Amino acid sequence: MEVFMDSTHTFIQIHPKDNTAVALTSLKKDSVLNLDGRMYTLLEDIPQGHKFALEKISAGSAVIKYGSPIGYATEEIPAGSWIHTHNMKTGLGDLLEYSYQKEFTSLEPQEERFFEGYRRTDGKAGVRNEIWIIPTVGCVNSIATSVAARAKEFQPDSVDAIVAFPHPYGCSQMGDDQEHTRQILADLIRHPNAAGVLVLGLGCENSNIEELKKYIGAVDEDRVKFLVAQEVEDEIEASLACIRQLCDYASTFQREKISCKELVIGMKCGGSDGLSGITANPTVGAFSDLLIARGGTTILTEVPEMFGAETLLMNRCRDEAVFDKTVDLINSFKNYFKSHNQTIYENPSPGNKKGGISTLEDKSLGCTQKSGSAPVADVLSYGQPVQTKGLNLLSAPGNDLVASTALAASGAQIVLFTTGRGTPFASPVPTVKISSNSKLYENKKNWIDFNCGALVDGGSIPEMGESLFDYVLEVASGRPVKAEEAGFHDMAIFKQGVTL
């Protein structure tokens, strides 16, 4: 029998109200644990990231984690027992009635910090000097990728990357899907990380260049080039000629000192485990507070992973108008699920469950740790550019690539992506992979940029948040993330309706 007297390195009770604790390392049956003088004997093995009961939980009673219910016991759970999907279930139902119960404190202003970025002619700040090739329709994807590959032969050092963003849409779409495609493409065309953009069309698609221009608005003709493949003899050579001009234009920009208040940072998680809500997500939350306290902006999305934690965000809304928008954000996504005859609460993936996440409430309460403690300043519809500094909520699904693309489309120059299982994906902007556990960091150093697993062995969330803030300023100043070093750039658009 082992006796663990130092709970800091073996398990944690996240909130004083919790009737559960989380194993920070794998714990063996019959181990005796000490929590502030209270002794617990484990009745079974507890894998890392998984929960065990700190007291007897009767059948039908709430299982408490993060100070909030994450479901209810389906049978009596003795103290020291493993708690997971075999003995607990979600408590979520359908639409709820909400009331505004204001509960937040404003952040104390922090000393201004700076990064070395690119000042665009429209006044926006970018963190990369790239050339983007944006197809209007999937029919020209191969042309776009071929042009990007060939253009690398003459890419100047002043250009960070020449990237194509293929996608399967732009035609055979109707209604909201067609609107979403046009809006997201227009958002990316205007993004400040792109020094120059080639908009590549076919000519006969629904979202043709003339239609897309209505969404883009006025453009700098030196920065944005348009090419219709059906209207030129050799679309490859014509595209390459455009890219050469864009490279010359991009070379006129140099990095300069810019205030961090101009940073817009997206926040996302995926492949989460039981430690994500204890290490990585709270660290991102601490980062978010630090940036907002300096006048910057963060965006939180993946709305289905707010279900079960939405009231915490609602009560942090800065006023009733933002509260009403947040209620609509949540209920609209619940109605989206219901319109497709899908249950609202069947979210945690097999990987989530293997990592210790038992219910959607469990996942959501961990997920929303990324929001820190700042008031919710605004709520954005899908594809809507950010307009208000501070913490913004964005309407987008939980899918990693769709949500991360939506963050970039709303103006994020960088995305912070926490994970407990690991993923190699990228988004249109630098995507910082943040591990919740050190094992992932050690095993996947070609994927992971920043490790929060060290918090299991000590250290503090505020200190880790400061370290992450310093790291993000380095990335904003040009330090490549692992996905960029691998040459990865991806995008995806939210689809809801029929395909013609």
Provide a role label for each language-model segment:
Residues T419:
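Short secondary-structure boundary segments
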Residues E2-I414, T423-P424, V429-L500:
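Metallocofactor- and cofactor-centric catalytic cores in central/energy metabolism, strongly enriched
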